[in-house]
Amino acid sequence: LIYFLYFCLNSIKRKQTLPALIIFYLLLLSIGTVAIKWDARSIWLFHAKRMFIDNSIFAQLDNYAIWSHNDYPVMLPLLSASFAKLVGFWNEIFPKTSNIFFILPPLLIFYSYLKSKPWFVFFSIGAFFILAKLVFNGYMDGILTLYTISTLIILHQFRSNPKNKTILLLAILQSCILVSIKNEGMFILTILIISLLITNLSQFKALFKKLWIFVIPYLFWLIWKLFCQYFQVDNDIEKGLLGVDDPINNIYIIFNDRSSFQSISLIFKN
C-alpha cells in the first residue's frame, strides 16, 4: 500500500481520483483473501448469508445460532447479501468486498479535510498500517474506526460553522451509519457529542439548539433494538455479564475474582 500510494502521489495528476484508487487497491486485497476469522465468518458473513437465503433483512431475528450475536446491526451484512444477490450465488469472498465500498465516504472526508495530496497519502499510510487486515478481512472494527474519525472531523467542522446546513446534514448521515455498523457505534457517538459540548462551553447554548437533530441516529439504533426486543433477541455477552436473575451477584463475582486482580498486579510489577 505504501508503494502504491507513493506511485499515485507522483503519477496521478487528478488528485480527486486518489481515494477511489485506494478503494480499488483494497478491493483487490479483499478479493484475494478468504474470511477465516471467527467474527468475519461466523457473525457478519453468517448474517449476510442468512439474509441472502431467506430474502429478509430480519432473518437473524429468529435468534437461530445465538452465539452469532443476532442483535448486531444489519447494515453491512445487508450490503454483502445484496452483492451476493447481484451475482446470483453465495461464496465466502465476493460478498465481503462490499465492506470496502463502505470506506469511500470516510476517505473523501479525510481528503477534503486535509486539503493536500501528500498529507492525505501520509494519513492513509498511517491509518491502514495501524488497521491492517481489519479493513478487508470481513471484520467491522476497522470500518468502525474510520467512521469514528470521520464523524469526529465532521463534528469539529460543525463546531466551527454550526449554521452550515451541508455540514449538519453530513454529520447526521455519518452518525446514522456509525450507529448502524456495530453496537459500539452508539456509545462512540454519545461520547463524541458529549465531548463536543464539554469542550465548547462558551457555545453550549448555540450548539445544543442544533444538536437536537442528532436524535435521528439514535432513532435508527432504537428502532433496531425495539425489533430485537420484540423478537426476544438478546446480547449473549450482556446477558452473561449482567444476568437476568441476579445481576448484582454476578457483578460481585466478577470483582471478587482474586485471580483477575492478581494477574493485573503481576503485569504492573513486571
Question: Where is each model-derived feature located?
Answer:
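Membrane-embedded, hydrophobic transmembrane alpha-helices
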Residues: 1-13
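Transmembrane-helix motifs of polytopic, lipid-linked glycan transferases
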Residues: 4-7, 94-119
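Membrane-lumen/periplasm interface segments of specific transmembrane helices
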Residues: 33, 80, 190, 198-199, ...
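Extracytoplasmic catalytic/substrate-binding loops of multi-pass membrane glycan-assembly enzymes
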Residues: 33-47, 53-79, 90, 235-240
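Multi-pass, polyprenyl lipid-linked donor-dependent membrane glycosyltransferases
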Residues: 95-102, 118-155
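Membrane-interface alpha helices of multi-pass inner-membrane proteins
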Residues: 133, 167-183, 189-194
